[in-house]
Amino acid sequence: MNAVEQAMEYIKTNNVKFIRFQFVDIHGEPKNIAYPVKAGAAGEEELYDVLEKGVYFDGSSIEGFVSIESSDMMLKPDLKTLSVLPWRPTEKSVARVICDVYTTNGKPFEGDPRGCLKRVLAKFDEELGGEFFVGPEPEFFILKEDACGSWVPADDAGYFDLEPLDGGCDIRRKIVFALENLGFHVEASHHEVAEGQHEVDFKFADAVKTADSVVTFKTTIKTLAAQDGLKATFMPKPFFGINGSGMHCHQSIWLNGEPSFYDESAQYQLSETCMSYVAGILDHAKSIVAVTNPTVNSYKRLVPGYEAPVNIAWANSNRSAIVRVPAPRGKGTRIEFRAPDPACNPYLAFTVMLAAGLDGVKRKLSAIEPVEKNIFAMSEAQKKAEGIESVPANLKAALDELENNSVLKDALGKHIFENFIEIKNAEWDSFRTAVTDWETKQYLKI
């Protein structure tokens, strides 16, 4: 059987009556068109045609896509991603398939975030025989509604706590089972540092599959929380005074089918490729965060304290540096970029991280010496003496860095780059001109 026939067999076996053709906008927010599966020979013929060729949609209302005068677009399903949604009824079930966005002339749409990542990966493969693997650690909060109608942390537990303190153990159990039904290899789940904060870790994979998984992960958790009358949020810093939510990204590149970060004879057992990749990440870090930390709120997390990864340095085990190389060495040697948060569009975030790292490899950059001291405890003068800079303090400063970065501009492509800058500058202006509760409390007495 070909791929379409296999998909039709899966649909029949699982009694699928609706298929969600899913894609994401420039923010990484999932969108979909629900296609009803029809009975009879005519229905089967139509289904085959849709699975093979895709479905048309109007792209003019999708932020960051196209204008109304050129709005017709097509969703072409990646049939490897077809999966029944485990939270929907098993009778007359609902499946989703992740799609690539195409123009009506049959070419990949340059504003499709998934297509953007695939384009950069294809170039990497063509030039260096390269593969990019990512293992993210997205954190999130589970909230409950209090008597005043406010959303507050659903439990009072802390890091690695057990029930009864850990009031989120039941919802995490449901999340793990649902993710496994969706094909995830879940490695661990636990309560995080802050009240109501959680983490569920899943196995690394190639960058496109991992980005698909991040989108599915967030949808699954939000849906299951809502079914229990709770709210799941991936907002980077929902509450003042406690840790925010990050999405540390473990990553490695393979060249010609072999891992490229390990060298038993080298200092720290890290290859020249690894050192140059780290140097590239550090060199572009101030621009990268505009994409990996893309909201005004992201920079409420990226402040000194609360274990925030603001220091542009690398280390072997020191978590106060923005890049860390975890202890295991060998085939699984990887680096960890600690700045990203789960508000990012994973396709675009992985694109800019890879582009930055590969720029370091191509330029044969040398990484500075690792900083194994606690950078959080250093004064600004001490950090300056060590040559340790910080990421931008707000979204606008990060956007200004990105706007002048030709490497990341080329990776994102003209369409996404210009739309991202425009949309995010508008977001910053909206924030900048808003009058906040803090200002009212502080200045109303004047």
From Swiss-Prot:
Protein name: Glutamine synthetase
GO molecular function terms listed in the Swiss-Prot or TrEMBL record: ATP binding; glutamine synthetase activity; metal ion binding
Ranges of residues in domain GS catalytic: 113-446
Free-text cofactor note: Binds 2 Mg(2+) ions per subunit.
Protein residues bound to ATP: 187, 250-252, 319, 324, 331
Cofactor names: Mg(2+)
Alphabetical list of Gene3D superfamilies matching this protein: Glutamine synthetase, N-terminal domain, Glutamine synthetase/guanido kinase, catalytic domain
SUPFAM superfamilies the record matches: Glutamine synthetase, N-terminal domain, Glutamine synthetase/guanido kinase
Nucleotide-binding listed as a keyword: yes
Residues involved in Mg(2+) 1 binding: 137, 248, 336
Pfam families the record matches: Gln-synt_C, Gln-synt_N
EC numbers, comma separated: 6.3.1.2
Residues reported in the UniProt entry to bind Mg(2+) 2: 139, 192, 199
